[in-house]
Each structure stands twice: as C-alpha cells, then as structure tokens.
Amino acid sequence: MSDQKAITSEQEMKAYRVQGFTCANCAGKFEKNVKQLSGVEDAKVNFGASKIAVYGNATIEELEKAGAFENLKVTPEKSARQASQEVKEDTKEDKVPFYKKHSTLLYASLLIAFGYLSSYVNGEENIVTTLLFLASMFIGGLSLFKVGLQNLLRFEFDMKTLMTVAVIGGAIIGEWAEVAIVVILFAISEALERFSMDRARQSIRSLMDIAPKEALVKRNGQEIMIHVDDIAVGDIMIVKPGQKIAMDGVVVSGYSAVNQAAITGESVPVEKTVDNEVFAGTLNEEGLLEVEITKLVEDTTISKIIHLVEEAQGERAPSQAFVDKFAKYYTPIIMIIAALVAIVPPLFFDGSWETWIYQGLAVLVVGCPCALVISTPISIVSAIGNAAKKGVLVKGGVYLEEMGALKAIAFDKTGTLTKGVPAVTDYNVLNKQINEKELLSIITALEYRSQHPLASAIMKKAEEENITYSDVQVEDFSSITGKGIKGIVNGTTYYIGSPKLFKELLTNDFDKDLEQNVTTLQNQGKTAMIIGTEKEILAVIAVADEVRESSKEILQKLHQLGIKKTIMLTGDNKGTANAIGGQVGVSDIEAELMPQDKLDFIKQLRSEYGNVAMVGDGVNDAPALAASTVGIAMGGAGTDTALETADVALMGDDLRKLPFTVKLSRKTLNIIKANITFAIAIKFIALLLVIPGWLTLWIAILSDMGATLLVALNGLRLMRVKE
C-alpha cells in the first residue's frame, strides 16, 4: 500500500454534492484545488454524479473557495429525507426555462444584434458599434475571462485559457464583431454541454424517487404514517393494493402480486406471500401485505443501487483515461501551433502580421478540446443510467467497455442456465390398472416424510395436479440408506428408490425395456426414481433441475451479437452436463469441475480469447467471477453479495437482460470511439484550412460548438437503447 493510500484510509471520508460543473476539465481543476487545502489529504471528484469525496477536514466555505473559478456550490451528502427534498429542488431547477437560467447570455446576444444593426447604420468603425460589441463580449464572457486570466498567470493551459488568449488577441487587432460572436457561441456551447450532462445525470437522480418517502407502520396498536428515515428494523409496514413499497422487508401476512420492474427490470408481477422478500420501490398490485422491515432506508436494495451507480459513474473508462492523457499534452501543443502560425509566415515568408495573427487566434479557438473532453463522460453516464433503469447494475465505464469487447462468456449451470430448483419432468405409470392420481398421492405422502433433496419436486408436482396427500396414512416409514425409502399404506409396503434398490428387491430379472428407459432418462440429465412393491414396479418418476425457458433463446442472441464462444461450467457428471448443454445450445461443456477447476478454466479462456465474462450467482462462483474480465452475477436484487462482488449485476433472477447488456456495451464502445474520432477529425480538418488562409474565427468557433453539440447528442442516444 502506498503512503498516500495509507493516509487516505486513515482519514474520514466525507461526500459532497457539487452544483455548477460545466465540463470535465473544470471538475479536474476543482479536485486539484481541493487537494491543495491544508486539512485535506486526498480528494476525488465524480464528474458523472456531480460529487466529491474529501479525505480529511475542510469546511464548505473552503471547498466553495476552491471552486470559486466556476462559482461552484457545495452541499453535504443528504439523508433520505434531505435527498428527497433535494431531488424535488433539482426537478424544479430543471423546469426553469433555458433562457432564464442563462439570462446574461440572452442580454449579450441582444447586444450583438444591436451591434450588427449599428454596424449596418453607422459603420464598423463607429464608437457606438464598438461599444455594443465590447459590452456583449464582457457580459457574455466575464466568467470566461476571470478563469482564463487566472490560468494564464499560473501558466495553466485549458480550453478557457485558449479562448481568453484568442479573445484578447482578436480585440487587439480590432476584430470586435467576430470576438463577440466567439464569446457568445462559446458560452452557448458550454451551456449546451452542461444541459446534456444534466440530462444524463437526471436518469440516475430519478432513481431516488422510485421508493415512497413515507410508509404506513403499525406502532403501539395504531397505524401511522412515518418518514422512512424514522422506520426501524422490525417495524411492521402495511402496504395496500396499488401502493409502492417503501422499505425492504419480509412478508408476515397477506398475499399479492408485486411488480418488481423498478428493481429487476421484470415486467411480469411476482407472487408474494408469507416469508417472501419484497423491495423498496416495487409496486404492490393486488392484495394487502404486512411486511416486517429488515433494512434501514440507507441499506435498502434501491439505495445500494443508487450508491453503486453513482460510484460507477466516477470510475474512469480506458477511453476516458486516454482522453485525459491526450488533453494534458494537446492544449499546450495547440498554443505552440497557434504561436507558430502567427509568427512564422510574417517573419520568414513576408506574410501580413495582421492576417497571420488572426489565423493564429483562429487556431486557438478551433483547438478548444470541449468536444473531446465530453465525448466519453456523456456516453458512460447515459449508458449506466439506461442500464440501471432496466434492471442491470454496471459498476463502471471500464466494465461497459470490456463488455463491449467480449469474445467468450462462461456460464455456471445450476441456477444460471437452469432454474436451480428440481422439478418432475416425467411420470410414467407402468401398471395401467392403477389410478395415476391415487398413486401420486401415495408417493407424495411417502416423500413428505423424507429428507431427500428431490422430495420437494414431487410435492410441487402434487400441488400442481391438485392432489391431496395429507389424509394418506403412512405406517412404519423408514429410510433405506443410499437407496431410497419405504412405508406401509393401506396394508401394502411401497418402495421409492434407485434402480439398484429394485434389482435387489425383485426376485425376477429387471425388465430390459424398463432398464433402457431409465438409462435414457439418465442420459438426458435426469434422476430416475422407481416406485413399486416387493413384487412389481408400478411407476417411474424422473426429476431434473429444469432448464430456464429463456436460456436457449438468450444463447442464440449472444451468438448473433458476435460472442464467439459460450461455455457451460458445472460440477455435475458428464451425462447431465451434456444433456443440459445440448438443450441450451452452448458451444462447449466442461463437467465434473471443482471450484479451483472453474478458476483455472477461466484463466485458460482469458489467455485464448482475451475478454471473457463469467456468469454465476455471485456467491459460489466468486473466484471464477473475480478471475474473469467481467464478472456477471444474477439475482442481484436478492443478495448483497452479488451487488458487492460482481462487476455487473443482473437484478432479476434470469438471463434475459444479458443480451441487452452486451448490446448496450457494444453500442457504448462504438459511440465513444466515434465521438473521439469525430472530435479529433473536425479539429484536424479545420486546422488544414490554415494552409490556404481560409480559417476564420467564425469557422473555428462553429466547428468547435458543432462538434461539442453533435458529440453530446450522440452520447445521449445511449439513454434510448432498448432491449
């Protein structure tokens, strides 16, 4: 551990919300300023979520002073009650018309219009015309000049430094009209950039409003409405039909269907009854439920999702790291190129000083890296927000990019490709004189007394067939270790067990057709159980871990999306593994694996394919998940472990969201690459116009503003990617 990390870990971390970020560069500068405060050991800005984590001691006044260059407002992280109020205030702020938020921009634009009118009436050199352009420039660019001049004095070069030098230079050579236009268009570009990021952030902030802020709670024999901040673990919450559930808990009374789309993305309501878990933010559609609270409001699943999503926005993707590194050298290089353009032609080629200084100033403007800087954050924030709303938690931009580059995906079998719950797949009565339902009631009555893990499958089958077994009298019930069970019903001794048990019981030879039938069932990955007496075999029941209905379709979609290899990893025997693997359509099957074998196999896949994902439950597969490029856990809504350990968590307990996540990730990767390429290309093309002397301040600022706007809109498209 480094000294810096050691210091950071010892300090108390305080989180703050920040209002007023216009760009990622401003966020980086704010972070640098905060780190320089005397009581601060470290600080980390999360531009995507508009937050800063401060390690050490700093007052609000000190933090706001560090952000004075951008007039940043800093507030401490809120409690649930305060956060709900903050969301309301943010919503009100969002509803304020664009022109009211940027009134100075409007006034500056009006002054420019009057300036051009005066230029037409009185001439360009008229003092009134000059004063109108000058006033427009100062009103529209005051904040720009303050920051730009401070940067110049400190020899810090960013986009505002470039613009300030360009504006001052333009004013010196008398290009008042063009300079005023540059200032206004730059201000508009910044406003649009901020608006775009706010739109992307709003998709996350809206998650905070999913769960109600108050709940009806039983206390001292009364039902009272209480704010969620004041609800304690163990309280009984009453949820009426049509109401949203305010807190996580367990049903203690009632039956209903609950729509969990807000958490898991599943559109089909899930039945809930006693002992079933419910989540804050989900909708109770039918019956009245009484729920015992199991988590405080800050620990609910939705709260953890919001927290993890905001943390994810702060994780820098590889493309963001590239942009940051590139921008560090890019701005000084642009300053040097602009200086060379302004000086070299007049000094060595008899060029006009005025013409080439103008060209140099245009290079400064066109070199402004606005579009480049926003290209990645706008895409990452939009994609993560979209995924969260559809029940997929992505822990950071790095995992979005790695998901987009996946070549192979490994799946655990049990509970992932299969339901993880045994079910009766075959029930064949061999003696046609016996009533099937009566025999099933006897079988169920015997299995009810058994501790065998497959007994639950038979009991579930009886419930589905509406067969009662509670009135069946079983005498002398006993377990035959390793072979089966037996019991007496109506004077007849019945046995349920393996083929081996009946080969020992029956005096006559084991029927060849029956043996073939059992072998076929076993080859299909099923466990065959025989029911009979000491004299004859009555029926065969096959039980298996059922394949999820969606597994085959999902694997087909993944192959269509370009995933080259899908592998099933399981500890089951080869027969069962091959049967299930064949049903779902995986490319490869690896059976009889120990946890260490799964880990080794993932490492082998990574060496062969590079980017490999592992899909499991987030608990038993933890080593393999950790070893993969991207660990994907299912059923994140029901387990804190999955939320914490996985890189990507599918909140619903099925794989339907996996193809969407791969699709979204690939689109994100493509859009980020397109944005970066376009942002750099447009600058390069504009710079080429310097050679024939065609580059003007108009063209420079319009290319910069246009590139920023197009990059932002392209990134926002990720909010609309559908399943």
Swiss-Prot record:
Key words, A-Z: ATP-binding, Cadmium, Cadmium resistance, Cell membrane, Ion transport, Magnesium, Membrane, Metal-binding, Nucleotide-binding, Phosphoprotein, Plasmid, Translocase, Transmembrane, Transmembrane helix, Transport
InterPro entries, sorted: ATPase_P-typ_cyto_dom_N (IPR023299), ATPase_P-typ_P_site (IPR018303), ATPase_P-typ_TM_dom_sf (IPR023298), ATPase_P-typ_transduc_dom_A_sf (IPR008250), Cation_Transport_ATPase_IB (IPR051014), HAD-like_sf (IPR036412), HAD_sf (IPR023214), Heavy-metal-associated_CS (IPR017969)
Annotated HMA domain residues: 12-75
EC identifiers of the protein: 7.2.2.21
Keyword Phosphoprotein on entry: yes
Record-level Gene Ontology MF annotations: ATP binding; ATP hydrolysis activity; metal ion binding; P-type cadmium transporter activity
Substrates-to-products reaction catalysed: Cd(2+)(in) + ATP + H2O = Cd(2+)(out) + ADP + phosphate + H(+)
Compartment(s) of residence: Cell membrane
Recorded GO CC terms: plasma membrane
Example of a GO biological process term: response to cadmium ion
Keyword Acetylation carried by entry: no
Active site location: D412
Residues at which Cd(2+) binds: C23, C26
Sequence intervals crossing the membrane: 103-123, 127-147, 168-188, 329-349, 361-381, 671-690, 694-716
Family: Belongs to the cation transport ATPase (P-type) (TC 3.A.3) family. Type IB subfamily.
Biological role stated in the UniProt entry: Couples the hydrolysis of ATP with the export of cadmium.
Name under which the protein is recorded: Probable cadmium-transporting ATPase
